[in-house]
């Protein structure tokens, strides 16, 4: 198969592992910077150009699109979809997952358990918003944030009001969520490929920090998950239309809660912690699904 990876940096661990896994299976694979692509949106003969050359059709495309380039990156991915390339995560699914508010609403519609979450526009509603999620301590999140950026733990009501006002002063869209104290700064990252959880790790925040992201100094260990956690992870990924996803689960006293669904999960932490070949599982999935005649779930 002829495969493209959409990524700004082919030297990143995840990209290098995907290239390695594809080449080991005899596939041709190329890393393409989506910001260097430009398109002819023509119903008769659509094309994609890259650094002065017209790209030929690829059998499959693996999007590794960072949050900062979601708009243009998914536009490029849609053009590949238009040309008939199989996307490992469709453009529509990625945009759903990148919008934290929309994704939580979709998950809630399917009855998936979540931390209690509030969203409001008017400063006049701040007091009620804080009460809706059970009061302080609580978590304030930027809707557009990733890797723990724009996530603040407010331990008192006064701190919560100050943080919310500060974000509003920047015209930022924010979510207010209950703080799951019993999780003690840890979460479970489930790596979903297709309809299976292929790996799971527990991430623990560093001392003095509540965000467990590995990019923020958190640590990881291999962990066994329950049947309920496995089912909720697969259901969350399926609800957003993602073939590959990192589903982050908080172990609360009332049961597992989906905190976030990541459409472009990093492979380094999961592979190094578990010793599993996740990149290989992703390429195998492409081999199974990326055949001529496939249909987009969403219509593109």
From Swiss-Prot:
Transmembrane segments: none annotated. Keywords: ATP-binding, Ligase, Magnesium, Manganese, Metal-binding, Nucleotide-binding, Protein biosynthesis. Mn(2+) 2 binds at residues 260, 262. InterPro entries: ATP-grasp, ATP-grasp_RimK-type, ATP_grasp_subdomain_1, RimK, Rimk_N, Rp_bS6_RimK/Lys_biosynth_LsyX. Mg(2+) 2 binds at residues 260, 262. Its cofactor is Mg(2+); Mn(2+). Binds 2 magnesium or manganese ions per subunit. ATP binds at residues 141, 178-179, 187, 211-213. GO terms for biological process: protein modification process; SOS response; translation. Mn(2+) 1 binds at residues 248, 260. Mg(2+) 1 binds at residues 248, 260. Its EC number is 6.3.2.-. One of its GO terms (molecular function) is ribosomal S6-glutamic acid ligase activity. It comes from the Bacteria. Belongs to the RimK family. This is Probable alpha-L-glutamate ligase.
């Amino acid at each position: 198969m002829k495969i493209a990876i959409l990524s700004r940096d082919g030297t990143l661990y995840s990209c290098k592992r995907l290239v390695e896994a594809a080449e080991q299976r005899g596939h041709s694979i190329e890393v393409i910077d989506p910001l260097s692509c430009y398109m002819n949106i023509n119903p008769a003969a659509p094309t994609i150009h890259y650094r002065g050359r017209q790209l030929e059709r690829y059998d499959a495309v693996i999007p590794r699109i960072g949050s900062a380039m979601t708009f243009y990156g998914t536009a490029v991915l849609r053009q590949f979809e238009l040309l008939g390339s199989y996307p490992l995560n469709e453009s529509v699914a990625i945009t759903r997952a990148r919008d934290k508010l929309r994704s939580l609403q979709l998950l809630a519609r399917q009855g998936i358990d979540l931390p209690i979450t509030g969203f409001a526009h008017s400063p006049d509603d701040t007091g009620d918003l804080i009460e809706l999620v059970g009061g302080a301590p609580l978590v304030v999140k930027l809707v557009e944030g990733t890797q723990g950026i724009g996530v603040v733990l407010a331990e008192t009501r006064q701190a919560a009001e100050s943080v919310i006002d500060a974000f509003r002063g920047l015209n930022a869209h924010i979510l207010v969520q209950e703080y799951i104290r019993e999780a003690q700064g840890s979460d479970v990252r489930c790596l979903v490929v297709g309809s299976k959880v292929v790996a799971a790790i527990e991430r623990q925040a560093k001392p003095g920090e509540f965000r467990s992201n590995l990019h923020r100094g958190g640590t990881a260990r291999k962990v066994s998950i329950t049947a309920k956690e496995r089912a909720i992870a697969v259901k969350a990924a399926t609800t957003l239309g993602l073939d590959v996803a990192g589903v982050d689960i908080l172990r609360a006293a009332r049961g597992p809660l989906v905190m976030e669904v990541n459409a472009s999960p990093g492979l380094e932490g999961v592979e190094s912690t578990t010793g599993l070949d996740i990149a290989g599982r992703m390429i195998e999935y492409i081999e199974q699904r990326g055949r001529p005649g496939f249909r987009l779930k969403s219509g593109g």
